[in-house]
């Protein structure tokens, strides 16, 4: 008789916190297209070396990192303005990432508390979610990058700690489970003492996924029972 495969033991959790870009909505490829176009104009390549640094950051921090890393001959403000103008024209087309809808509806069915914590600022968030307002109405609350309490972007802890304390009742941060696709987001969650499930882009270096509690190729692969949550049923 074959030996049973050991099941990983993770801490049971109650509230769940989700990132948005590249995890719930497929926006990362849209960002890549825009920044590639701008950087190519200056003879620079927007590749995964720089992309992995900016994933999860606030918009101005992203622009600053790209300008400095690639030594672009424009200011961070100029890059931000042009990229935002181009993004506003395409972000409304973003669809769901695999498994996102099913997982959120499963959590809602079982009346589990879950929220969204995204570095996106208000106007950008509204554009991204304009075709999915009913879906995002399922979340207990949403914390955005321009929230007054979010002083420091990821990998700073502000956004996840702010999001956690807005549950009712507020949980101990260690009882939260975060879902992320970016190294910056994973680092922020770990600094908060939270467990974090990472669903990285296939092109992201495996070295940048090692800090995550659990790494999955898709939200379809998430097994809630590993964290003490109700399992999916056929």
UniProtKB/Swiss-Prot annotation:
Say which family it is in: Belongs to the HAD-like hydrolase superfamily. CbbY/CbbZ/Gph/YieH family.
- Cofactor dependence: Mg(2+)
Per UniProt, the keywords (alphabetical) are: Hydrolase, Magnesium, Metal-binding, Nucleotide metabolism
Name recorded for this polypeptide: Pseudouridine-5'-phosphatase
Its function, per the record, reads: Dephosphorylates pseudouridine 5'-phosphate, a potential intermediate in rRNA degradation. Pseudouridine is then excreted intact in urine.
* Annotated GO MF terms: metal ion binding; pseudouridine 5'-phosphatase activity
NCBIfam families in the cross-refs: HAD-SF-IA-v3
Q: Per its UniProt record, what InterPro entries does this chain match? A: Gpp1/Gpp2-like (IPR045228), HAD-like_sf (IPR036412), HAD-SF_hydro_IA (IPR006439), HAD_2 (IPR041492), HAD_sf (IPR023214), PGP-like_dom2 (IPR023198)
Quick check: keyword Magnesium in the entry? Answer: yes
The annotated active site, in chain numbering, is 19 (nucleophile), 21 (proton donor)
Q: Does the keyword Metal-binding apply?
A: yes
- Gene3D superfamilies in UniProt: HAD superfamily/HAD-like, Putative phosphatase, domain 2
Q: Give the top-level enzyme category.
A: hydrolase
Q: Name one Pfam family in it.
A: HAD_2
- Record PANTHER family: 2-DEOXYGLUCOSE-6-PHOSPHATE PHOSPHATASE 2, PSEUDOURIDINE-5'-PHOSPHATASE
Task: From the UniProt record, list the coiled-coil ranges.
Answer: none
Q: Which residues bind Mg(2+)?
A: 19, 21
The catalytic activity, as recorded, is: psi-UMP + H2O = pseudouridine + phosphate
Look up the record and give one Gene Ontology term from the biological process aspect.
nucleotide metabolic process
E.C. code: 3.1.3.96
